[in-house]
């Protein structure tokens, strides 16, 4: 009987060739999901995957448990089997202050001779997900379980097999007989937002936060559902290990070894020695928190030396050699006192929760957005409820849950207005949209005010001498009705306003005069066309080059512009069909607003064409906005963070962590002068 590796079918395809195809797909998955550096386009990966599926369909006897096709998922389960952890998955003690961190360091002095303040620690972000155990037997994923109570968890093997960045087979020649990888499964913020958006479109229940979404996804009885969820694993340690080869002697080196055999490990892990470096890591990660792209709730600090870890040992539920230094709480409970309804620039009616003030994530919160009527219904919230407030980074505080058992008897239902609270025009909700809108248009004072505030904002016309309070006064006295009226103001008129002296009035007029010289992209953005943001305005300017061409563009021509679909194209067409809008634009131009028409840049052979670029540091010859606009004219994607997908980093003066990360990843770094030279600008 021939060996399995020598078997072949009637077409001449051998098992060895099939296995080579699997190995190629595993390599592509590793580079795509772990290194974030795809080797081939998605279409090529899909073609090879289909080829493998067809071959395995013809030869079911050739299917192996570690085949990439086996991620698709098994049949739905009736329930989860229990798994006993050979080595308990203990939790960590927490520290919430520098003093508590000092206490952690002091406690170690009783168990080791070394000074804890001179020890090396492996420092990791504390990921906000679900702890899991993944067992590899002879290099093949064999079993996965949740942490559960630390002793017993649930068997989630079928679901873990669907997580794209978890290898089904280790990337090594002589794998351990048994290797238990421990890590955190979480959902990146972008994936979470997309998941909730799709749920809303389907009228399904949304998740309150990424952690709940990750946990709910892993505990699906149908693995095919889990497969559709954007889950990610980051390993943080090793449990069971059986092999003739010894593991590295430090925790940091063990994580690097895991990474080398295909197990994903977080990129922010660092070594630190002593109290000051530990605190510096904490501060650094806290500062990065809003831009990481995934939720963390603190740092995890572990003694790096494995021998010292063993000396320090454990207390009843946690190791003595590690601690979680947590950030200030991002969720707190408070009472919903009332709901007010605000009217935005486009007429959107937004319910705003008025809360009993509560301290959350370092600030006192008394207001929180409720988004729209659907969100109120989803939460099942009423006035008087005790609610859970969440504030993450710079995100506007939001209500994520209701404590039903605390609902008072006098709780009051929230009534969504049928008439605008400002102008009393009818409020309507367009089919397919979650937002209700005032139909008053610019008849509505709230919409006029917000439109003017948008027009003068920094990224629009950048009239820094005209702020929100001045706009309110100008509108109250009916001195300004449209943006064009700003350019008709006189010194004597401004002098009659409250807290407006001669110098302040002149500064405002100087800012207004300066704003007349702008760019086509800024002007388009300032007009406040619904869904035309900075990037879309820049794309329109780059595509059509002048305002007349944009005004004359048809629905079909507009859709030829990058990122302009049917909805946005329709809104642009409708904007120019409204006589009032045309009058305002012509009035603005008659007041002297001007710009240079966009010159089509020859980018056929330019190295910047279509690249992903990050700006960092202080630029001296261009403003940040000018540099961004210049890059976009070359079709560049301007990103805020460095990754392996970044093509160029443009580094100005005092470039910091982004420069270091770019150098670490081998990203091409340009000085400001080199960047300008590439663009051909003088």
UniProtKB/Swiss-Prot annotation:
Keyword Magnesium belongs to the record: yes
GO cellular component, one term: cytosol
EC id: 6.5.1.2
Molecular-function GO term, any one: DNA ligase (NAD+) activity
Active site residues according to the UniProt entry: 126
InterPro entries assigned: BRCT_dom (IPR001357), BRCT_dom_sf (IPR036420), DisA/LigA_HHH (IPR041663), DNA_ligase (IPR001679), DNA_ligase_AS (IPR018239), DNA_ligase_CS (IPR033136), DNAligase_adenylation (IPR013839), DNAligase_N (IPR013840)
Domain BRCT: 603-682
Keywords linked to the UniProt accession: DNA damage, DNA repair, DNA replication, Ligase, Magnesium, Manganese, Metal-binding, NAD, Zinc
Position of the signal peptide: none
Gene Ontology terms: biological process: DNA repair; DNA replication
Domain of life: Bacteria
Job description of the protein: DNA ligase that catalyzes the formation of phosphodiester linkages between 5'-phosphoryl and 3'-hydroxyl groups in double-stranded DNA using NAD as a coenzyme and as the energy source for the reaction. It is essential for DNA replication and repair of damaged DNA.
Family, similarity comment: Belongs to the NAD-dependent DNA ligase family. LigA subfamily.
Name by which UniProt lists this protein: DNA ligase
